[in-house]
Amino acid sequence: MSQTITLPVTGRLTIKQYNADGVLIDERNINNVVVDSGKQHIRDRVLGSGSISGATGVMSYMSIGYGTGGGQTSTALVNEVGTRVGATGAASSTNAILYYGSFGSSNPSGATGITEAGLFNTITGSTGIMLARTTFSVINKGTADTLAITWTITIG
């Protein structure tokens, strides 16, 4: 007799926008979707099998963009802008991982309305696996502004 155990994988992020003087001008707390490819990546890492993209397959990059489409089956942001940034990950409890990333001045190179963010295992947009994605109402990021993102992935 086999037994099936279901562990939900959920995500939540906090986005803080700072102006050029370091003053907090916006803060958002947003739930997100852990996409199918992200769940499959977790499965493959546990099994030690599957095709793992990236140097080690570790989720360690964040990206921002503009777009509202996509969902559970998404594998990329709708319109990624700027350069992906390194996301430092650390265990925060027995079942959660915290990622920290920051999009500083000139990333992207001009003022942009940001409406989506993603968590990936590679620095380039054309390869790799997306773990999680979220959309939100527009954050108008000025060229000199910084977006600081704290992303929590919880299993179980």
Segments the model singles out, each with a brief description of its role:
Residues 1-115, 122-156:
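Small cysteine-rich, disulfide-bonded extracellular modules of the LU/uPAR three-finger superfamily
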